[in-house]
Amino acid sequence: MLARTCSFCGKTIEPGTGIMYVRKDGAILYFCSNKCKKNMIGLNRVPRYVRWTNEYHELKKMRTRS
């Protein structure tokens, strides 16, 4: 089986766990938890600005290097 990554926080999702969400346009989003799904779908939050996501930490590293 193929391990997936969460579309919001960037964590790896083990096979048989997580949530697969399909948008009306056919885009498939994978979530590791209901917390990630609620933040992205329900609250329309962007992972860049949420402190506990991998994308936020990667951008923070880039900012502190410069």
Curated annotation (Swiss-Prot):
C4-type zinc-finger residues: 6-36
GO molecular-function terms, A-Z: rRNA binding; structural constituent of ribosome; zinc ion binding
InterPro entries given in the database record: L24e/L24_sf, Ribosomal_eL24, Ribosomal_eL24-rel_arc, Ribosomal_eL24-rel_N, Ribosomal_eL24_CS, TRASH_dom
Subunit structure: Part of the 50S ribosomal subunit. Forms a cluster with proteins L3 and L14.
Family: Belongs to the eukaryotic ribosomal protein eL24 family.
Protein's job: Binds to the 23S rRNA.
Name of the protein described by the UniProt record: Large ribosomal subunit protein eL24
Organism name: Thermoplasma volcanium (strain ATCC 51530 / DSM 4299 / JCM 9571 / NBRC 15438 / GSS1)
Gene this chain is encoded by: rpl24e
